[in-house]
A protein has these predicted regions:
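Juxtacatalytic substrate-recognition/specificity segment
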Residues: 27-152, 159-169, 211-226, 262-276
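Beta/coil-rich, acidic/histidine-enriched accessory regions frequently appended to metallopeptidases
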Residues: 31-34, 227-230, 262-421, 428, ...
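Post-HExxH zinc-binding segment in Zn-dependent metallohydrolases
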Residues: 89, 143-211, 280-285
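Canonical positions in the second alpha-helix
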Residues: 363, 388, 421-422, 463-464, ...
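Structural marker of alpha-solenoid helical repeat scaffolds
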Residues: 366, 391, 425, 467, ...
Length: 679
């Protein structure tokens, strides 16, 4: 028997060093990274390569979805952050619970009015596919007018089947099909799938009539869905399969116009839109379904013991963009910020909220000792600020998220204190300006008061929109502020921008109706309120019915729905956030004089030729307009806030243009611009 030889003493230091190095490498977690692609932010601890792959896959899925809707551009009015975790332990510690257990899928979506989040478990392959259904709903909500449940769910299920790599997109398979059997640890076969796939539902003899399918109510606004293993989901999926691949989306738009705007009965609308009866339409979809042999081949394979479910797709085509088409930036993210982000996501999941709050409070209290920001009331914090920014301790993101949570629960004093602490730690965080504006609005709502610090609120919201131009909620809040400030035309411009960015948001539509009421445009307000009174949101429906009842009194007695706006609301006050966007502060100061009280001068209309534009005192501008033998000079305090029609943005280079203007006279041959139309 061979004897083990002793290790020479001279080798021990080298071996010990190697062990220490290995231990150190194992113990050190990969750094957190923050990656930015064209449309998404990815936060990951899985390394830059994985982070780039996640960003690429979501950009690819976004591009494929745009092609399905035949759109050149998709809007994203709520910022989306993707948290991609390398291990399943932290993933399951924050995942939503179902019957007391974390969900089994490797990805989930957390929606919000201010931010959306996606969380992925990168320990699983292609984890992004787990959120494809919700991702489709999100993009659909922002980029397609209100539709019916079969359309939304059918398109989301179709998109859920997507597979994408660096070269090819594959789509169209049964998204609910899985293997019927699996092997346990002892290689014994056990039954795995008990629910029917969509293909199996459609293979039966009974289908819903198209009229019944198209009239079934199904709320998709909350992202809260039950099982997808139903005939409704199966038939909706196949109808959209047919419409997309037979290029019938334009006819579908016609159908929705007939049903939702012209109130044509469903069967008649099907006939007019698709050129066939409801029965013929149903048969066309059935024939299309039976022609998709790949679905039946995959179903047969899934029923065979020892054979994995087939991933064969119905359609394949080249990727719309690949790794070489992407510009993705990357930078380290402090560990405390990453932990605060994870805690924020927990706070937004009801069953995880208490754990998330404890983590945020610990992060907010951590760090070197410092003087806390002075505690004041919510009204004091919302309407005025100290000339010097107070100091605070802890993590800025944690303070900001705690402020958001306090706002959601009506704890306004606490929210104001947390925002003050966050601003003391990082006055350049634009999110603070947004949440400060939201806080002012919520205080006014809850106490039935006017919004305090209105001029600063509008200044802050303009800074937010400069940072993220597609932020619909900032446009909406700006519309509300301008309405209260006595500028209904500018308010209408902001609210319409919000609705264009998020066409299914009924709260924005309600605010637009309120702007119409303020301007006594009764018919326009009635049209919107009549639509809203049938809303699935009971609070919005009740408000719409109440306002419809008020319109008669408004018309009869001439009562204004927005009277007595205090001039003091528009007095500019010093804010700790001025340093964020100095030019916005200057524009707000320039406007203060004109916005200091309700302008009772009558509006006048003029058509003529734009001779010259003087921007020497930017952002103010003076336009010289000739109309016949008359020449007038019309001024705007901020051309970036001027209501424009017929042009995307104001230009100081305009010359010799036909224009129409609304203005308020300010002396002989002079006035203040209200709106400008380029003809």
């Amino acid at each position: 028997m061979a004897r083990a030889r002793p290790i020479p003493i001279s080798f021990l230091p080298a071996m010990l060093l190697g062990v220490l190095l290995c231990t150190s490498a194992t113990a050190t977690e990969p750094p957190w990274l923050e990656l930015h692609s064209t449309h998404f932010t990815v936060i990951t601890d899985a390394g830059e390569k994985k982070g780039r792959e996640v960003a690429l896959r979501f950009e690819q899925m976004r591009a494929v979805f745009a092609s399905l809707l035949a759109k050149d551009r998709l809007r994203l009015p709520v910022p989306l952050t993707i948290l991609a975790l390398k291990n399943d332990k932290p993933f399951y510690q924050m995942a939503p619970l179902r019957q007391g257990q974390p969900i089994s899928v490797p990805g989930f979506f957390v929606p919000g009015d201010d931010q959306n989040f996606i969380v992925l478990n990168l320990f699983e392959e292609e984890s992004w596919r787990a959120v494809a259904h919700d991702f489709a709903h999100m993009l659909l909500n922002y980029n397609y007018p209100p539709a019916q449940g079969w359309f939304d769910e059918g398109l989301a299920e179709y998109f859920r089947s997507i597979r994408v790599d660096n070269k090819q997109v594959a789509i169209g398979s049964d998204p609910e099909l899985g293997a019927s059997f699996s092997d346990d640890l002892l290689q014994n076969q056990r039954e795995l799938r008990t629910s029917k796939s969509l293909t199996e539902f459609l293979g039966g003899q009974v289908w819903l009539s198209m009229a019944d399918l198209f009239t079934m109510r199904h709320d998709t606004s909350t992202y809260q869905e039950g099982t997808h293993h139903t005939l409704f989901y199966a038939q909706s999926w196949m109808v959209m399969h047919y419409l997309l691949n037979q290029k019938k989306l334009p006819e579908t738009g016609t159908y929705f116009d007939l049903v939702q705007n012209q109130h044509v009965p469903v069967e008649e609308a099907i006939s007019k839109a698709y050129g066939m009866s409801s029965a013929q339409f149903e048969q066309a979809v059935k024939d299309y379904f039976h022609s998709l042999r790949a679905l039946f081949t995959a179903l047969d394979a899934s029923k065979q013991p020892g054979v994995a479910a087939s991933a064969a797709q119905v359609y394949q085509f080249p990727v719309p963009l690949g790794p070489d088409d992407m510009v993705i930036s990357s930078k380290p993210l402090p560990d405390a910020d990453a932990r605060a982000l994870a805690a924020e996501i927990k706070v937004r999941i009801p069953e995880r909220r208490e754990v998330g709050l404890k983590e945020l409070q610990a992060l907010a209290a951590a760090g070197p000792e410092s003087h806390a920001a002075p505690k004041r009331s919510a009204e004091e914090n919302a309407s005025e600020s100290n000339s010097a920014i107070a100091t605070a301790t802890g993590n800025e993101l944690a303070h900001r998220v705690l402020a958001w949570d306090h706002i959601q629960h009506g704890e306004f004093d606490e929210a104001a204190e947390e925002l003050g602490n966050a601003a003391a730690l990082n006055q350049h965080d634009v999110w603070i300006r947004y949440y400060l504006s939201l806080l002012k609005y919520r205080i006014a709502q809850s106490k039935h008061l006017e919004i305090q610090g209105l001029a600063n609120m509008m200044q802050d919201l303009r800074a937010v929109l400069d940072w993220y131009p597609e932020f619909a909620d900032a446009d909406d809040l700006l519309g509300v502020a301008r309405t209260e400030g006595g500028s209904p035309v500018a308010a209408m411009q902001a609210e319409r921008a919000a609705i264009q960015l998020s066409p299914r948001n009924e709260q924005y539509v309600l605010h637009l109706a309120e702007i119409y009421l303020t301007g006594k445009n009764w018919e326009a307000a009635k049209a919107l309120l009549e639509r809203l009174k049938a809303s699935g949101n009971t609070q919005i429906a009740a408000t719409a019915r109440e306002k419809l009842g008020q319109i008669g009194n408004e018309q009869k007695y001439g009562m204004s729905s927005a009277t007595g706006t205090a001039a003091g609301n528009l007095t500019t006050q010093k804010s700790p956030f001025d340093a964020l966007v100095q030019d916005a502060a200057e524009r707000a100061a320039a406007q203060t004089k004109s916005e200091a009280g309700p302008d009772k001068r009558p509006s006048q209309y003029l058509k003529g030729n734009l001779v010259a534009v003087d921007c020497s005192q930017s952002p103010a501008a003076t336009l010289t307009i000739a109309s016949g033998a008359r020449t007038v000079k019309l001024r705007t305090g901020d051309f970036k806030s001027l209501l424009l029609i017929g042009a995307d943005q104001f230009s100081c280079e305009w010359r010799d243009r036909s224009v129409s203007v609304n203005y308020k006279a300010a002396g002989r041959g002079a006035g203040d611009l209200v709106s400008l139309e380029i003809r």
